[in-house]
A protein has these predicted regions:
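Short acidic-aromatic active-site loops that bind/stabilize oxyanions
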Residues: 53, 98, 102
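Catalytic cysteine-centered active-site loop
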Residues: 83, 87-91, 98, 119-131
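Secondary-structure boundary elements
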Residues: 28-93
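Short, well-ordered strand-loop elements centered on a beta-strand within folded domains, enriched
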Residues: 89-91, 96-98, 145-151
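Hydrophobic/aromatic-rich core segments of domains that either
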Residues: 103-177
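Linear, non-domain "peripheral" regions
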Residues: 1-44
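Leloir-type glycosyltransferase catalytic cores
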Residues: 171-193
Length: 193
């Protein structure tokens, strides 16, 4: 795994004293209390839903479906940045039931790590398109191949407000992602080892 979700941070500040001593202050996304609660919830969900005879793909699908079926997209945070939920972290979907793309991605990454499956977060920031916000999703190594896994887009907000589950972005290749998104979203152009 490339970067563990719990190592994510929002701010880094360095201070140099008169004696040239450097102090670094890091604002992490997760507190120790949140990490403990998240780990307990991951263990609980895993034990209730995953069996030893499942294939890796079945395990991923089970967790994918569990997270989506128990999470609502946090429209408030996406619209104006204000929300009472920790939806941008794994805490949101796992303990509060709300997520933005970062929350879905971090939650899924924690389960993939528990399964021993290599993964990393793919971040897309459009260069010239002001109509699209940045987006993140998981890249997953399965059977020596890399696939895209996007729980956010598999948990769409329907116009009638109803929740539903889809698998359109479940373990798809880069070529499949390009075809689905009509080349609008930058995707992985090289192979990862």
């Amino acid at each position: 795994n490339y970067v563990h979700p719990f190592n994510g941070f929002s701010n880094v500040k360095t201070v140099i004293s008169e004696t040239r001593e450097i102090t670094v202050f890091i604002d992490y996304f997760y507190t120790n209390e949140e990490i403990k609660a998240i780990n307990e919830k991951v263990d609980e969900i895993y034990e209730k839903n995953i069996t030893s005879n499942m294939s890796d793909e079945d395990k991923i699908k089970t967790i994918h479906d569990y997270i989506i079926n128990n999470t609502k997209y946090d429209v408030e945070r996406n619209n104006d940045g204000k929300s009472p939920y920790h939806s941008y972290t794994a805490y949101g979907p796992l303990l509060e039931g709300y997520a933005t793309c970062n929350g879905y991605t971090d939650a899924m990454a924690l389960f993939l790590i528990k399964m021993g499956i290599s993964n990393f977060k793919v971040a897309m920031t459009p260069e010239n398109n002001q109509d699209i916000d940045g987006h993140v999703w998981n890249a997953v190594k399965l059977n020596n191949e890399w696939y895209h896994l996007d729980l956010t887009w598999d948990d769409p907000v329907s116009s009638d407000g109803k929740d539903y589950l889809q698998h359109k972005y479940f373990l798809i290749t880069t070529q499949e992602l390009k075809e689905i998104d009509d080349g609008e979203v930058p995707v992985l152009e090289h192979q990862f080892k």
